[in-house]
Each structure stands twice: as C-alpha cells, then as structure tokens.
C-alpha cells in the first residue's frame, strides 16, 4: 500500500499579490534614491564651479608683472594673468569670465547641472573667487 500526501492549494485570491504597503514603500524608496542622487550631483557641480574659480584665480595671481620681481608693486600682469586663468578654465572644462585689475583678479565660473531623476530642469551652478597678490 502506498500513501500519498496532498497539500491544500493556495487560495486563488492570494496568488501573486503583494501588499499595498510593500508597493508604496518600494516607490518611496526609489523616489528617495533619485532625490539623493540628484542632490549629490548638484552639490558636485556647485563645488566644481567654486573650485575651478579658486584655482583659476590662483593661476592668474601667479602671473605677476616684471616690476614685482624688481621689488616694486606686486601687480598681476593683466594679459598673462587672464591667459593663465582662461587656460585653467579650459582644461577644467568650465565656462567663466576673468577680470584682472592691479593686484586683484576676479573669476566667475558657471557649470550647468542637469538632474537625472527629478524633473526640475537644468540649473546653472556658479562659482566666484577673488585673488590678490601680497608682498611679504
């Protein structure tokens, strides 16, 4: 004699279903992940603009005039300083403006940020830096 064991079939109403809570939780987690991702890329691009402005200002302020080497005012050579700053910005892939005046250089940069998940549209992140030469 052979015995067979039979299991009761699952009720038809529960086949392949998931709770409403689990579905809403999954959607909420995906939305939060998208917001975190887009927030981090926005901060990255804002930092890129600020860092590029700072470093371009440093590059420009190193282009001092020949009179500064001779011991007079530590003025920045306007053409050499602007060229050095623009070269740095081009190498960094950042758009920007350069203004050199006497011992000061002002750099303004802009980076376009485009979100990946949140449909808010592109935004421009700007950075601004001012560098001065100081005789010590």
Tell me what each language-model feature is:
Residues 2-76:
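Alpha-helical assembly-interface signal, strongest on the long, hydrophobic N-terminal helix that forms
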Residues 3-5, 115-136:
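Low-complexity, S/T/G/P-rich flexible repeat/linker segments used as non-globular hinges
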Residues 10-17, 106-115:
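Short secondary-structure transition/capping segments
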Residues 22, 46, 79, 86, ...:
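Alpha-helix boundary/capping detector
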Residues 23-33, 99-112, 132-136:
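Hydrophobic transmembrane alpha-helix bundles
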Residues 38, 112, 120:
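Residue-level signal for pocket-adjacent positions within structured domains
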Residues 59-111:
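Short amphipathic secondary-structure patches
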